[in-house]
Amino acid sequence: MPEFRVWAPKPALVRLDVNGAVHAMTRSADGWWHTTVAAPADARYGYLLDDDPTVLPDPRSARQPDGVHARSQRWEPPGQFGAARTDTGWPGRSVEGAVIYELHIGTFTTAGTFDAAIEKLDYLVDLGIDFVELMPVNSFAGTRGWGYDGVLWYSVHEPYGGPDGLVRFIDACHARRLGVLIDAVFNHLGPSGNYLPRFGPYLSSASNPWGDGINIAGADSDEVRHYIIDCALRWMRDFHADGLRLDAVHALVDTTAVHVLEELANATRWLSGQLGRPLSLIAETDRNDPRLITRPSHGGYGITAQWNDDIHHAIHTAVSGERQGYYADFGSLATLAYTLRNGYFHAGTYSSFRRRRHGRALDTSAIPATRLLAYTCTHDQVGNRALGDRPSQYLTGGQLAIKAALTLGSPYTAMLFMGEEWGASSPFQFFCSHPEPELAHSTVAGRKEEFAEHGWAADDIPDPQDPQTFQRCKLNWAEAGSGEHARLHRFYRDLIALRHNEADLADPWLDHLMVDYDEQQRWVVMRRGQLMIACNLGAEPTCVPVSGELVLAWESPIIGDNSTELAAYSLAILRAAEPA
């Protein structure tokens, strides 16, 4: 018979409801309640706290077939009490140096399910992708959302296909030698369906922009930390994910001697040894703090890699000319060159946006560039714009190609956001489907007020609750094979193939990277061994003082003995001639 266990130190009485039958539970001194009850494999169950007749879902629920406010359903990972997995031959691979593809299951396809996404995996293989990174798939209130307001971290969002759908998706990825990363949000809980405070002290007094913080350093926080780490390991052990992207780790306020991220990294290394395959943790952080990716033996946390917004900002502003908000300190080619060579632009320097010093220098002799992720756009960089407009909606094809070349041609681990490889015309706007009218109204009003401060008219801001906002974010796959979209797609595919096949592009050390530029003529050259990535960021043709064998180009460069003429907004990748 299955055992039911729940950590609930707060209530004086906890009872188990299985398919409507109520059972007593026994409390241990550590706040765990437990009982053993005969229950079908698909039983619906939940917990009754004190004298409240409301049946609450299991905080560690594996499945919520009727949403986050309803009863949980028993579910066991395949291979334990059900059918065997089909990916047992998958050896795994490290994420360092890979090409990652970030996608949102709900908008990646028309159907918005794991099974529909499986049908696009061969396309990703042909593109040259190494890892798929799923935006959060944990359960959240409503049917539509980015997933970052999850409240039942252990369960899989049912409209996507639930836990069985995720198993099928990961097996299908592994059959094609694609790794899978899952975006995990441990810094806050969503505003709808969060019953954890009824069970125990899961929340802290420390708040962040998204809500109450998580109690990872206060009284009774040991079990909360276990809750986080067990959840993280479960994605990799039970679902066979190859790693996690950890959302906004700077919002994890931990004053203990061993940070929860270091504890998680240690547990992940242990699980990797048990499973016999590599597992990766990628931290999203805005602190430019290399201690995250420094080995524990050298005083770091031992996280595999981290997102790097400085590289995005440096490339985006140099190409687009945008300088608003946190772009204020970026924009020049000098800034671009410095950031590409050093990993961070702000490394203890003054940030005008933050109005203080920011960041810490990266030891480029000890930490390879593959520990940092470079990208031209992400769900954040697109979705946090007022209209959710992609770079493809305001830049030329040549400008998009330049951004891609500087990113994929760099020594950093690279990441694409779904559809960028063909210049998708669909936006990626903020959307949600809160079932509570008051919460829905406050979310819509808050979005409009936020952008009104930046000069946007309220009527211009998409309504996140409107189903059409969600619908317009779905990729239009038909355009990927037509016209300029197809041309950009071919360029991306050729560029990724070059990255995979050229030994010089696999060199992870920034000390070997050279970047030349001319601020007035608007050209930049990134040198990777014998390869030179020459880009004209200007609106007029220009001559770049490099020459060699043409490897790949956007537009048609004129290559001379000592220089190359580039058309406006174009690039050429050249191979230097071998010394005579």
Swiss-Prot record:
The active site annotation covers D247, E284
What are the protein's GO molecular function terms? 4-alpha-D-(1->4)-alpha-D-glucanotrehalose trehalohydrolase activity
Q: List the disulfide bonds.
A: none
Q: Does the keyword Transferase apply?
A: no
Q: Which GO terms describe its cellular component?
A: cytosol
Name the positions where substrate binds: 245-250, 309-313, 379-384
The main location class comes to: cytoplasm
Q: Kindly list the places in or outside the cell where this protein is found, as annotated in its UniProt entry.
A: Cytoplasm
Stretches of Basic and acidic residues bias are at 60-69
Region annotated Disordered sits at: 56-88
EC id: 3.2.1.141
Q: Print the keywords alphabetically.
A: Carbohydrate metabolism, Cytoplasm, Glycosidase, Hydrolase
Instruction: Give the catalytic activity.
Output: hydrolysis of (1->4)-alpha-D-glucosidic linkage in 4-alpha-D-[(1->4)-alpha-D-glucanosyl]n trehalose to yield trehalose and (1->4)-alpha-D-glucan
The record, for Pfam families, names: Alpha-amylase, DUF3459
Q: What happens when the gene is disrupted?
A: Inactivation of treZ does not affect the production of both capsular alpha-D-glucan and glycogen. Cells lacking this gene are not affected in their multiplication or persistence in the BALB/c mouse infection model.
Q: Which domain of life is it from?
A: Bacteria
Q: Which PANTHER family match?
A: 1,4-ALPHA-GLUCAN-BRANCHING ENZYME, MALTO-OLIGOSYLTREHALOSE TREHALOHYDROLASE
State what this protein does: Is involved in the biosynthesis of trehalose but not in that of capsular glucan and glycogen.
Q: Which NCBIfam families does this entry report, sorted A to Z?
A: trehalose_TreZ (TIGR02402)
By sequence similarity, the record places it as follows: Belongs to the glycosyl hydrolase 13 family.
> What is the name listed in the Swiss-Prot or TrEMBL entry for this protein?
Malto-oligosyltrehalose trehalohydrolase
Question: What are the leading ranks of the lineage?
Answer: Bacteria, Bacillati, Actinomycetota, Actinomycetes, Mycobacteriales
